[in-house]
Amino acid sequence: KRAVKNLLAQKPIQYIIGKSFFRSLTLNVNENVLIPRPETEELVDWVVEDFRNIYPKKNIIDVGTGSGCIAISLAKELKRNIVYALDNDDAILELAKQNAKKNNVQVNFFKKDINFLNSLNLKIDVVVSNPPYVLNKEKKNMKLNVLKHEPHEAIFVNDEDPLKFYRLILDYAKLNLEKSG
């Protein structure tokens, strides 16, 4: 009865059942994190394809990990590499840690605000991220289930500075990306 009420209120089924599927993974999700999307699976495909047969092991970082879908997939599929993941919220990181454990992979999680990413001081070979990119003014075009239930800070960016997160990630990469990265 409650599930039907939630569906009628446009709550995504993934939040109602508390899980989502991403590649070969089953992930716990809640309204603190975005529901993993097929487009994000394509991002993981590109990284896996590019680094599947690369030696020696690489340090990979997922910036803004959310549910951990990217980091956990990379840890599972690129086993010999070291995967780091960061987000700025304890509850989000706890959920991502649960997902890593549930999927039997080792991911090194850090709590870090993206505005202070450079203070991480971690040399890496691969930077992966699916940062917010939808302009606030585009909210009117979004489906109600997204607007009502998914975390806006993981989707929307300030209209005046839409590339903020990309710039911060690029600044980090310029300082910390290994020459082979």
List PLM regions with ranges.
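Soluble or luminal CAZymes and related metallo-dependent hydrolases
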Residues: 1, 88, 161-165
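Conserved SAM/SAH cofactor-binding pocket of Class I
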Residues: 39-141
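S-adenosylmethionine
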Residues: 10, 124-125, 147
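Conserved AdoMet
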Residues: 1-50
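Acidic, proline/glycine-rich intrinsically disordered inter-domain spacer in sigma factors
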Residues: 34, 58, 83, 154-161
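Class I S-adenosylmethionine-dependent transferase superfamily signal
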Residues: 74, 146, 169, 173
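Conserved Class I SAM-dependent methyltransferase catalytic core
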Residues: 159-181
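Mobile active-site "lid"/loop adjacent to the S-adenosyl-L-methionine
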Residues: 133-165
